[in-house]
């Protein structure tokens, strides 16, 4: 097969998958599977709205590119993979001053680490709908290619 059919398939896949993954942000879920809700305390501080969108920086940071025979999605935000995959991780709490509510005395809290659990809120990855979209793209491009071959054959 000519190289440009691969390029066309990969280019179409890149556009379609980017659209599908950004739709996951709008739908607040991964192809119909709703994300785990945030804690009530977080909702009160931030107000109502989308679970993963406060400033929109993570959604805007998602980039897609074609590398070889694959479409690759990247982000320059360090927390993107953490949200997409979920998991436990350690956070270092810096030393700081705290004032006691009872006595009014100020004391220093030493630096320490705390375990955090991030629930998975996947928005990029393999899914049945991704496979269906890719299948549709390949089928459409192969039909166009075979039609061009038939037209060229009939002209000669």
Labelled PLM ranges:
Residues 1-156:
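Short, Lys/Arg-rich flexible segments
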